[in-house]
UniProtKB/Swiss-Prot annotation:
Its main location: cytoplasm. Gene3D superfamilies: Fumarase/aspartase (C-terminal domain), Fumarase/aspartase (Central domain). Belongs to the class-II fumarase/aspartase family. Homotetramer. One of its GO terms (cellular component) is cytoplasm. Catalyzes an anti cycloisomerization. This is 3-carboxy-cis,cis-muconate cycloisomerase. The gene is pcaB.
Amino acid sequence: MTNQLFDAYFTAPAMREIFSDRGRLQGMLDFEAALARAEAAAGLVPHSAVAAIEAACKAERYDVGALANAIATAGNSAIPLVKALGKVIASGVPEAERYVHLGATSQDAMDTGLVLQLRDALDLIEADLGKLADTLSQQALKHADTPMVGRTWLQHATPVTLGMKLAGVLGALTRHRQRLQELGPPCWCCSSGGASGSLAALGSKAMPVAEALAEQLKLSLPEQPWHTQRDRLVEFASVLGLVAGSLGKFGRDVSLLMQTEAGEVFEPSAPGKGGSSTMPHKRNPVGAAVLIGAATRVPGLVSTLFAAMPQEHERSLGLWHAEWETLPDICCLVSGALRQAQVIAEGIEVDAARMRRNLDLTQGLVLAEAVSIVLARTLGRDRAHHLLEQCCQRAVAEQRHLRAVLGDDPQVSAELSAEELD
């Protein structure tokens, strides 16, 4: 659900506009206008009525508050909107009112309107993903040789580079872009099945009208009615769930690297950003929090859509209703995470000197694997691994650098010269 206090933080303005109350109404009204044009082409609606219907299909002409109250009684948003649309038309061209919503059902208007919104949402998400991918690519190249410690199980492991970490995020987002592109037109289907999805109301004109409607709205014509077959919507939401998860991983890593004990990278600073109400020294990862928050919420929302798939017969009771706010919320959360990820990627501040100090924090232990691999050539893997494990334990216990411990060990010295150890 939208919330004025938090929308600016968690969502992007352009996505909020797509799924605003006016945006939702306009999607359904676009369906009604296109339906009138399609039916006029099939000889079911006089061309003189089309202009009146089109003129009335402007969301700004309708009272959102009044419609909201009516929805609470009607059970869906299309019923009161179609009634209001008819009244507006009747006030100007009374004879055109009878042709409004001809042969359609509420779910046709709502589902098609939603698909139009989702298509716009996808355009926005794809554009933001492309921009973020370009930025991450530039930063990965810039930091291809910026060494830092790799961490496994939250412990220092072996050296990596910041460029490698950023390239990993880039790779995931590139795969998600491909997944979204593969959804393509088949995912964006209009709905024109009528009351029970059988197209019965329009008789022999039903298919020509359905084809013309799809063409008018630049949507695909489904093979069958999909009032209770929701797999396309769930597939789209699932890919957005993957996007949210990968952005959350990016945000999680950034936030961990911003910890005082690490201090290796930082979100870009700005006046008033990331401060504390009580601690003047704080620099909180407020952007990363949005990424992690979206990655936490979106999977639950996607699971709601999966749970809503076994819809009853030809129109569902409650399961369809569960989608109405869920899909927009997913899109809004992903858009907000993409916006914050772009800010982080563009302005990320890197403390390369701190990275180097952290590499040295364990006094050479991060290079133990490299020594073990070299020794394995002559000692065998298991023996070399055990030997290095003992040397590492001794280095920690004696608080000495691993290089010094290795140099003192007779088994190591027998295999590697001082120059090779260096």
